Amino acid sequence: MTSIEIPDNVTSLGEYAFFCCSGLKSVTIGNGITSIGEKTFYGCVELTTITIPDGIISIGYSAFEDCNLTSITIPVSVTNIEGRAFWGYRNLKSITYEGTIAEWEKIVRGDNWNNSKLVVHCTDGDINIE
């Protein structure tokens, strides 16, 4: 499987749903999703970019661990990013956040949610994460 489109009538992506789907390159997440579960995309090494739609509230533990993400867009609806969500490959250099710096600072982020230096691009400026 190289691509997947999750329809709008699906409300959550369960734990391990696409675990180690090494050939998965493209994911379109429907607007009905409110959470991405633990290790949902863990080990999807061909997945390089993803846009998380508005309405997602939580990104689970290790949800994108060991993916080869280079960029990700996170909506202002996200209030929780659990530990190791973007852990693994160090190619993730930027996050586009669709809210302000103050809104980004309010997001609950678990320990080791990310392991690389990156820039979070907010609507009112950038944040450098070491």
Regions found by a protein language model. Name each.
Residues 1-12, 22-35, 45-58, 67-80, ...:
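Structural signature of tandem-repeat unit edges
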Residues 87, 107-112:
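A structural signal for leucine-rich repeat
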